[in-house]
Amino acid sequence: MAKTIQAYIKLQVSAGTANPSPPIGPALGQKGINIMEFCKAFNTRTNNLEKGLPIPTIITVYSDKSFSFITKTPPASVLLKKAAGITKGSSKPNQNKVGTITMQQILDIAQIKKIDMTGSNIDNISKSIIGTANSIGLIIAEGTNK
């Protein structure tokens, strides 16, 4: 007999550094999940990623208190800020530009995001990432990466 799903929990958890403190502990604890078991499994699955990178995670909680989880790719805005070498986006992206990113860097990010995004091809995904870059105040430079 198949397990019945009790709930879905969506969290952004830092890669390789999951611990029982908020927001993980309270979110999982109220559903009756073994928090340390999740933290160990998550850290094992994300140990090949850069520590501290926020990873969107969807946790499926079953009625017998077991769980499974899916990790997604980091948000495009995080990847863009990392590629541009900035820590935060512009508060007025149309007026103040805070960094520059090349088209090659956008294509590299599109390749990473291709796994999760529903865009039919790399061009559509790149356009979406360009929109995100504009919304955080980045200038798109022509040319290749360094």
From Swiss-Prot:
Coiled coil: none annotated. Gene3D superfamilies: Ribosomal protein L11, C-terminal domain, Ribosomal protein L11/L12, N-terminal domain. SMART domains: RL11. Keywords: Methylation, Ribonucleoprotein, Ribosomal protein, RNA-binding, rRNA-binding. GO terms for cellular component: cytosolic large ribosomal subunit. GO terms for molecular function: large ribosomal subunit rRNA binding; structural constituent of ribosome. GO terms for biological process: translation. SUPFAM superfamilies: Ribosomal L11/L12e N-terminal domain, Ribosomal protein L11, C-terminal domain. It holds the Pfam family Ribosomal_L11. InterPro entries: Ribosomal_uL11 (IPR000911), Ribosomal_uL11_bac-typ (IPR006519), Ribosomal_uL11_C (IPR020783), Ribosomal_uL11_C_sf (IPR036769), Ribosomal_uL11_CS (IPR020785), Ribosomal_uL11_N (IPR020784), Ribosomal_uL11_N_sf (IPR036796). One or more lysine residues are methylated. Signal peptide: none annotated. Forms part of the ribosomal stalk which helps the ribosome interact with GTP-bound translation factors. Belongs to the universal ribosomal protein uL11 family. PANTHER family: 60S RIBOSOMAL PROTEIN L12, LARGE RIBOSOMAL SUBUNIT PROTEIN UL11M. Part of the ribosomal stalk of the 50S ribosomal subunit. Interacts with L10 and the large rRNA to form the base of the stalk. L10 forms an elongated spine to which L12 dimers bind in a sequential fashion forming a multimeric L10(L12)X complex. This is Large ribosomal subunit protein uL11. It comes from Buchnera aphidicola subsp. Baizongia pistaciae (strain Bp). The gene is rplK.
